[in-house]
């Protein structure tokens, strides 16, 4: 897994070699750091999760409908400093894929992406806790109703297969199938300004060798307001508001209860500065106040969660 992780990282960095003005290769590379301060579910002296990630895409001008996409990610849990994880777990993710999109009419664009996501979780002793391979099929479309209004939908179907877990966990098969939906609109009301609103839903159906239903579902409305405040600066306000049943999981593993619920809404703001059309800096902060968790035993706990992000977008 580490060899694959390193190889994908080298491929991402190697894409910069094509950043010549006359090259037929175009794309972007986006390094990102995120601090998830969940206070470790309320425990004292807990440290945040540090997320480091590189995402990007690569296109060849002779084949404009095809795009290679990738993500390389590392999560360090319960660690005081970046790359200093001595007590917590570390998760690695490699997420390559290929996307085909085509403009069918002047207003309608159709697309299909195929992605293969590998994840590995290690403890502080570098012992493997689990590996999971996820196959993903992602159809999407966008439709320009007017020059200002666009409708869009993306549906992701996935299958997760777990490997290399402890004998106790391996005795209970926990592969899963699921889907994720984004569907909404974008309205551009001024140059460089837009309002976006998406309905988002994720559903997972866990598989067991000898157990019954085990499902989870999460539903949100996700609005974003983007305001260009100057030639080089943009401010974006966004939210993630739970609707319907919110975030719920049913688990039939012999616990006291079979239902887990979590209520949380996120409020965030991003500050975007364009040094040039090809070099962009983005920093942001978000909070989920008064998160309410109802566990399987019926006990209710409340937390305040915070997220701090920074990323660089380099286009070539």
Language-model segments: which ranges?
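Repeated loop/turn-to-beta-strand initiation elements of outer-membrane beta-barrel proteins
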Residues: 25-27, 62-68, 105-112, 147-153, ...
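Detector for outer-membrane/organellar transmembrane beta-barrel domains
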Residues: 142-254
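Cleavable N-terminal export/targeting peptides
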Residues: 1-30, 63-67
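Residues on the lipid-exposed face of transmembrane beta-strands in outer-membrane beta-barrel proteins
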Residues: 54-60, 96-102, 139-143, 181-187, ...
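Outer-membrane beta-barrel "beta-signal"
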Residues: 285, 302-316
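Transmembrane beta-barrel strands of outer-membrane/channel proteins
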Residues: 29-37, 68-74, 112-118, 153-159, ...
């Amino acid at each position: 897994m580490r060899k694959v992780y390193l190889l994908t990282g080298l491929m991402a960095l190697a894409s910069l070699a094509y950043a010549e003005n006359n090259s037929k290769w175009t794309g972007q590379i986006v390094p990102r750091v995120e601090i998830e301060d969940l206070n470790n579910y309320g425990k004292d002296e807990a440290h945040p999760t540090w997320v480091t990630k590189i995402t990007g895409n690569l296109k060849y001008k002779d084949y404009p409908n095809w795009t290679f996409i990738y993500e390389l990610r590392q999560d360090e849990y319960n660690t005081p400093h970046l790359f200093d994880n001595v007590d917590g777990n570390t998760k690695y993710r490699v997420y390559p894929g290929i996307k085909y999109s085509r403009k069918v009419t002047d207003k309608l664009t159709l697309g299909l992406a195929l992605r293969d996501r590998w994840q590995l979780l290690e403890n502080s002793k570098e012992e493997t806790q689990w590996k999971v391979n996820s196959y993903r099929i992602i159809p999407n479309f966008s439709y320009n109703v007017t020059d200002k209004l666009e409708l869009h939908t993306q549906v992701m179907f996935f299958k997760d297969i777990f490997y290399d877990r402890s004998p106790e966990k391996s005795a209970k098969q926990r592969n899963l199938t699921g889907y994720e939906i984004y569907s909404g609109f974008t309205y551009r009301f001024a140059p460089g300004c837009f309002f976006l609103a998406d309905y988002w839903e994720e559903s997972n159906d866990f598989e067991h060798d000898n157990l019954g239903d085990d499902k989870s579902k999460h539903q949100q409305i996700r609005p974003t307001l983007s305001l260009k405040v100057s030639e080089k600066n943009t401010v974006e306000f966004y939210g993630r508001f739970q609707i319907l049943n919110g975030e719920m999981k049913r688990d039939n593993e012999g616990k006291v209860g079979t239902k887990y619920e979590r209520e949380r809404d996120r409020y965030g703001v991003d500050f975007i500065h364009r040094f040039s059309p090809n070099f962009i800096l983005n920093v942001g902060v978000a909070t989920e106040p008064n998160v309410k968790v109802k566990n399987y035993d019926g006990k209710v706990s409340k937390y305040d969660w915070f997220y701090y992000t920074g990323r660089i977008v380099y286009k070539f």
